[in-house]
Each structure stands twice: as structure tokens, then as C-alpha cells.
Amino acid sequence: MDIAMRAVEITSIGGFDKVTWDGASDTYPSKCIMYQLSHKEALTIVHEAHLRGLVTYFSAGFKFNEIRHGVFAGVDGIGIGGAQVLRYMDSQSGMHGPYMEENIPRILANRDEAAKSARGRGVQLLARLDTMYFEGSLSREEDVLRQKLFAALLAAEETEIEDLLLRLARVAALPSEGVTPHLHRAKRLVEAERPMMKEFCSAEQWEGLLRTLRSLIVARDEANIVEEYDSDPWLSLREKYRMSQCPRDSRICYVRQASFTLQIKA
């Protein structure tokens, strides 16, 4: 668990956007990471990563009956066992044969069944709430409900989860981001009534930022929204908001401000 959390810390400090936990070991075929983490641990590390704006992935070896555990952890993506689910493997020699695309509908059915349950819908909502907490578009009242939802999911309290799904219906109804995450991030800020980030600037500064974002949202200009995201006043405003989230006694506050791309030569 400490190693898994350190991965979140390193990824945040490095300014990266995605963290992956790999469950591969020295066995073949490999076992998925859910054999190394309890449900509570898996949910917690994904939750902590989402609070820092990271995309999450569990790599290696998920089989049919394990897919639901990935769904209930709230992880953004999982690695399906290619040698066990999507490809024929000779049990004696270990040699791989052709891909078995006929298994894809079964994979999706297992995922969808878990996603439609109370816990599945609850953890999807938690992922969105955690992301909105990171970007500062939640209200204080919604943030209290976010914390209650996390506790209910840890305890698998389905009645409480259903109640919170109703109370947070506004957030649950927000559209998926698709291929324009910054456009939707800007829309959530513009449409929020009492976003927490607003507390860290003057009314004039806030209105100035919203005017800029509204024009870019209308134009659906993802590229220029990214530029605004990495520039002032949005950048410095996020810095103030992020620093407010750090415990007062913490020696290091690891938060990521920018969405820069690292140029790496092949």
C-alpha cells in the first residue's frame, strides 16, 4: 500500500497525467493486482490519484470474474489478460495462438453489469467528484457529500450509496469528457454556482476568467483552453487553491499545476 501511494506522489511531483499499477509478478501467466490489494486499498489508491487529477490504470492479467473488482475500485482502465482471455494459450507449452475476439462481448458485458450496480454507479460518481475537487469546481456542500460517498463505498453500504446518488444528481448528470477534457473542465467551472476555487480570487478576477472561458467554450476550442489552463490567471489561481489542500504540518505538498507535455527524443 505504501508503494502504491508513493507512485501517486512521484507521478504528481513529476508533472505527469497518468499513474499505472502493474500486478505482474514472476509467475506465468500473471495474476491481476487485485490479488495484492484489498477492495478498500484499491479504492483508496485510485481515489487519492483522482484527487490529484491523475488518470489511473491497473495493468496485467484481469480475467472475466475479476473485471468487476476493477470497476468497483473506480480505476479508469484495466489490462485484460491477453494470454488468458483474448488469446489462446497452450496449457502445456505456454505457446500463444490466435486472438479470440469472440470474447470481447463477454468482457464488455461483465464490465457493464458491474457498472450498472449501485456500487458501480457510486464509484463512477466518486471519480467525477474527485476530479472536480482537483479542479476546484465543487461547492463546499458537494465536497461534504463527496467524502460521505467515499466512506459509503469503502463500507459497500448500498442504501447509503443510492441516497447519495440522488443527492448528487446534478453532478451525476454531467456529460462525459470524451476527447475534450479541458473543454469540459472549463464548462464545469463556468456552470458551477459556488465553486471552491472562486474563494481564492476577487470577484473581478473570477468574472474575467469566466468571460475568457465562455468564448472558448462556445468555439469548442480545446487547444486554446489548454493554453489558458497553463497560463495566468487560471494557473496562479489553481496554485492558491492547491496549496490550501495541503495539511498545515506537511513538509512537502505534492500537487501538479500544469498539463505540459515532455519532449522526449526517440
Please identify what each model-predicted range represents.
Residues 20-28, 73-101:
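Glycine-rich phosphate-binding active-site loops on the catalytic face of alpha/beta enzymes
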Residues 128-168, 191-251, 256:
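Amphipathic, non-membrane alpha-helical rod segments
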Residues 96-140, 158-191, 195-198, 260:
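Extended, intrinsically disordered, low-complexity segments
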Residues 10-11, 49, 70, 107:
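Generic structural signal for hydrophobic
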Residues 5-7, 62-77:
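Catalytic cores of alpha/beta
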Residues 1, 56-65:
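Glycine-rich beta-to-alpha transition loops that act as phosphate-gripper elements at the mouths
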Residues 1-33, 52:
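Conserved anion-binding
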Residues 34-58, 99-114:
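Alpha-helix-loop-beta-strand connector modules within alpha/beta enzyme cores
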